Amino acid sequence: MYQSKEERVHHVFEKIYKHYDRMNSVISFRRHLKWREDTMKRMNVQKGKKALDVCCGTADWTIALAEAVGPSGEVYGLDFSKNMLQVGEQKVKERQLANVKLIHGNAMNIPFPDNTFDYVTIGFGLRNVPDYMTVLKEMYRVVKPGGKVVCLETSQPTLIGFRQLYYFYFRFIMPLFGKLFAKSYEEYSWLQESARDFPGRDELAQMFRDAGFVDIEVKSYTFGVAAMHLGHKR
């Protein structure tokens, strides 16, 4: 039976939620933590501000934002997988973060008014949405003038030799890790497909410009396997 991209992605994350955090560490060799840490430094998040984490998943970046804005700030996490949000809710509860609210919703139609947030982030989620540009424009819409929108995502390595190794790893090794650690071979096969088909850093930077962002900053990580794109709204 035919499944749309959105339906397939929803099925994937509703199934792998229990193993998602562990598998992130396995797949990236824990580098994703360093990538996010560096991205947060570049964002220079200020106390008392308001942030939205789109495709928040199990809320790791949401929590990092909440700690950065402090008790006087507000952070919202948005995701379409209720199972992923349940894991996130437990983390928020354990940390007693009163300034965090997790919302079940769709990145293609963000349920907030225009010009609401100082920061809007999306971490390893943009490649899974049905239409990249629609989501970038939605993020642009809800960020305030002067605010920042940040995407941390897999990218396309350009280093000869390493690029071929990267594709081999994602195509053959990562699904095996999924089967071994999460009993989810098919689901992790999908994740490698989404990473393979995602735009490279220069193409995504142009998409940021097309969505209306200015003063775009791009930073590649670990030979280009991931990249941060940061755009400002005038």
Curated annotation (Swiss-Prot):
A Pfam family of this chain: Ubie_methyltran
Binding annotation for S-adenosyl-L-methionine = T58, D79, N106, A107
Q: Does the keyword Cell membrane apply?
A: no
The protein's Enzyme Commission number: 2.1.1.163
**What SUPFAM superfamilies does the annotation carry?**
S-adenosyl-L-methionine-dependent methyltransferases
Protein keywords: Menaquinone biosynthesis, Methyltransferase, S-adenosyl-L-methionine, Transferase
Q: Which reaction does it catalyse?
A: a 2-demethylmenaquinol + S-adenosyl-L-methionine = a menaquinol + S-adenosyl-L-homocysteine + H(+)
Pathway, per UniProt? Quinol/quinone metabolism; menaquinone biosynthesis; menaquinol from 1,4-dihydroxy-2-naphthoate: step 2/2
Some GO term, biological process aspect, for this entry: which one?
Answer: menaquinone biosynthetic process
GO MF terms on file? demethylmenaquinone methyltransferase activity
- Which HAMAP family does the record match to this protein? MenG_UbiE_methyltr (MF_01813)
Q: What does this protein do?
A: Methyltransferase required for the conversion of demethylmenaquinol (DMKH2) to menaquinol (MKH2).
Q: Which family does it belong to?
A: Belongs to the class I-like SAM-binding methyltransferase superfamily. MenG/UbiE family.
Name of this chain's protein: Demethylmenaquinone methyltransferase
Biological source species: Geobacillus sp. (strain WCH70)
